[in-house]
């Protein structure tokens, strides 16, 4: 019913069913994992009005599992990528796997999928830093970087009358920086990946 993928490793489709509505994937050597993809295999859909809450568990210093809600998969959104590199320390959140005796070794983490009502899932809040960067966040970063550069560069602006002649320094007119800034913004709005070509 479910699959799990870690970059550089084989796809896992052998989720251990630990309860009627709960499934677990083991992630050995989890310390080297940055992102995890969880997906439906397409063979068995969720029952109507149901979906899967996706949890990440890692062992704390005492070996006890710490569970964190990453997000959700549904028939309408059958796959998701989660960033787990920043979640390997700290405290967990409420989860449905607490009363189960799931064996866990110090270097093995787990991905848990709990089949739940969509209404119940909508009331849960995944950990904020598990979401993977999107084009929107990249565009937002680029915009902030452009603004910062433009503000920094123009903070040194002086008029021609204020310039002290120095043959070893090169000056760039501020209107050239502004033109570049506006051109870059326009190109980013048209295609956020234009810089790759």
From Swiss-Prot:
Q: Give this protein's Gene Ontology molecular function annotations.
A: Hsp70 protein binding; nuclear import signal receptor activity
- Quote the subcellular location field of this record: Cytoplasm, Cytosol; Nucleus
Its recorded name reads: Protein Hikeshi
Which organism encodes this protein?
Xenopus laevis
Answer whether the UniProt record assigns the keyword Nucleus to this protein.
Answer: yes
Annotated GO biological processes are: cellular response to heat; protein import into nucleus; protein transport
Q: Which UniProt keywords apply?
A: Cytoplasm, Nucleus, Protein transport, Transport
> Where does it sit, as one GO cellular component term?
cytosol
Query: A Pfam family for this UniProt protein?
Result: Hikeshi-like_N
């Amino acid at each position: 019913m479910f699959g799990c993928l870690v970059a550089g490793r084989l796809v896992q489709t052998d989720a251990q069913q630990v309860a009627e509505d709960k499934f677990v994937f083991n992630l050995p050597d989890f310390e080297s994992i940055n992102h995890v993809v969880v997906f439906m295999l397409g063979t068995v859909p969720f029952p109507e009005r149901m979906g899967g809450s996706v949890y990440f568990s890692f062992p704390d210093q005492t070996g006890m599992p710490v569970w964190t809600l990453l997000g959700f998969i549904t028939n309408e959104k059958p796959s998701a990528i989660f960033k787990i590199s920043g979640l390997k320390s700290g405290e967990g959140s409420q989860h449905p796997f607490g009363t189960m005796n799931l064996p866990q070794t110090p270097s093995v983490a787990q991905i848990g999928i709990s089949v739940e009502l969509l209404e119940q899932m909508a009331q849960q809040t995944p950990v904020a830093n598990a979401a993977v960067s999107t084009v929107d966040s990249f565009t937002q970063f680029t915009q902030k970087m452009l603004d910062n550069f433009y503000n920094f560069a123009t903070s040194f602006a002086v008029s021609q009358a204020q310039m002290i002649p120095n043959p070893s320094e090169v000056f760039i007119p501020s209107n050239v920086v502004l033109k570049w800034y506006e051109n870059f913004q326009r190109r980013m709005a048209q295609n956020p990946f234009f810089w790759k070509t």
